[in-house]
Amino acid sequence: MAPNIRKSHPLLKIINNSLIDLPSPSNISAWWNFGSLLGICLITQILTGLLLAMHYTADTSLAFSSVAHTCRNVQYGWLIRNLHANGASFFFICIYLHIGRGFYYGSYLYKETWNTGVILLLTLMATAFVGYVLPWGQMSFWGATVITNLFSAIPYIGQTLVEWAWGGFSVDNPTLTRFFALHFLLPFLIAGITIIHLTFLHESGSNNPLGIVSHCDKIPFHPYFSLKDILGFTLMFIPLLILAFFSPNLLGDPENFTPANPLVTPPHIKPEWYFLFAYAILRSIPNKLGGVLALAASVLILFLIPFLHKSKQRSMTFRPLSQMLFWLLVANLLILTWIGSQPVEHPFIIIGQTASFTYFLILLILFPTIGALENKMLY
């Protein structure tokens, strides 16, 4: 029999083992689609970003005009820009759902895969932040000023660190230039870490909704899940295209239609919707350093999740108490997202503080406690 090139060629063999003959659990649900959706998001963002970079000028006097020029005068420039801006939102929707899936079904017990995933989330957040600054609108400028200024809360080296990051004494031309360089570089770093993420995943194989070992019942990735993924791509691209064509500025901030002006502060400085939960946690503490620590902890807490798993069952499928707690956490995050978009006044302050406290309470104390309690009830 002639050797199959797909299985013998050094490069094709890697692709074959990752995307074609990959043994996959037979019972994984649509929640397992989000990994491939994130891959498609990354490819789309890199391609649209590359096309935008060809028309963008990283200079404070030209950045805003160059974006306007791209939308007005470049063939389909408006579409590329709208896909890129809204593609970021879909990227975050997918990654949050992907993390939620991992949390619900106990996928975090594959520690290396989980930790590289958290590093990917942090890199994605950094990429989105520096990218938001590039159009050099009012919210771009003031968002950059407020968030980079947080580093000044670090004792002793803070102020030096901020001035070093700015390349001067305020957010100005050097800042914009380096942010553009970083925004160009980081997606390729994300692509590299993604390969590491997949390497670790393929060491152990995928988890499944039952949270049990599935070695006895595997099926090839192609055609079963490759087809299922194509359906996922379609279901994601349809809303993305609707958003890009019909209401491209729905998720943006109206302040960004005004060119950056260091002399005029917008009434409410707030980041894009996907950072609002963390922004609410930052604002809930009336001390600068405390707020920065809480902000960092709100994301870095994900590294602790594998160590807080006290249940004898991996998945939450058969753990109703943990399920209730999980959906309480989801509701809590939605409340934080809403609070982050509101002005700092009564009653939003106290709601934000309560929701921030509850967020850490659920993750650090209630989840391990309920896990141990369920063990007592079940075994």
UniProtKB/Swiss-Prot annotation:
A ubiquinone binds at H202. Gene3D superfamilies: Cytochrome Bc1 Complex, Chain C. GO terms for cellular component: mitochondrial inner membrane; respiratory chain complex III. Keywords: Electron transport, Heme, Iron, Membrane, Metal-binding, Mitochondrion, Mitochondrion inner membrane, Respiratory chain, Transmembrane, Transmembrane helix, Transport, Ubiquinone. Disulfide bonds: none annotated. It holds the Pfam family Cytochrome_B. It is a multi-pass membrane protein. One of its GO terms (molecular function) is metal ion binding. PROSITE patterns: CYTB_CTER (PS51003), CYTB_NTER (PS51002). The chain crosses the membrane at residues 34-54, 78-99, 114-134, 179-199, 227-247, 289-309, 321-341, 348-368. Binds 2 heme b groups non-covalently. Heme b b566 binds at H98, H197. Heme 1 (or BL or b562) is low-potential and absorbs at about 562 nm, and heme 2 (or BH or b566) is high-potential and absorbs at about 566 nm. Component of the ubiquinol-cytochrome c reductase complex (complex III or cytochrome b-c1 complex) that is part of the mitochondrial respiratory chain. The b-c1 complex mediates electron transfer from ubiquinol to cytochrome c. Contributes to the generation of a proton gradient across the mitochondrial membrane that is then used for ATP synthesis. This is Cytochrome b. The gene is MT-CYB.
